[in-house]
A protein has these predicted regions:
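Short, charged surface segments at domain edges that flank catalytic/cofactor-binding sites
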Residues: 1-41
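Histidine-centered nuclease catalytic patch
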Residues: 41-77
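Short Cys/His-centered divalent metal-binding micro-motifs
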Residues: 44-45, 76-102
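Acidic, low-complexity intrinsically disordered regions
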Residues: 33, 70, 100-101
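Short linear functional motifs in flexible/disordered or boundary regions
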Residues: 29, 48-51, 93-96
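Short intrinsically disordered terminal tails
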Residues: 1, 102-105
């Protein structure tokens, strides 16, 4: 596998994704789509990307270290807080596995 590459195309995609998140945050009807996918908290889009713990940072659902071919894949992008993204690192997030069943089951 190859390492993450910081290409012009990736920088442009990162900026476009940030702008889309900021536009969604400005629209109360669609704000939920701009929240941090890891903690569901509101992201501070008024500051530069990655400048504070509460600022926006593009996160990859499937970490680039696990599948570099998805680095520039829009469907692999998620809005996150810088802090949440850094805490997660390159681990795959634990998702909900479905409906809960009774403890006696």
């Amino acid at each position: 596998m190859t390492a993450r590459q910081n290409t012009r195309r990736m920088n442009r995609l990162r900026q476009e994704f940030f702008e889309e998140g900021r536009a969604l945050d400005a629209d109360p009807a669609r704000r939920k789509e701009s929240l941090c996918w890891l903690c569901a908290g509101r992201i501070d889009y008024s500051v530069g990307q990655g400048t504070t713990d509460e600022s926006h940072e593009l996160d990859h659902v499937v970490p680039v270290s696990k599948d570099p071919s998805l680095q520039e894949e829009w469907s692999n992008f998620r809005n996150s807080h810088r802090r949440c993204n850094r805490e997660r690192g390159d681990r795959t997030p634990l998702g909900d596995t479905g409906d809960r069943v009774a403890a006696w089951w």
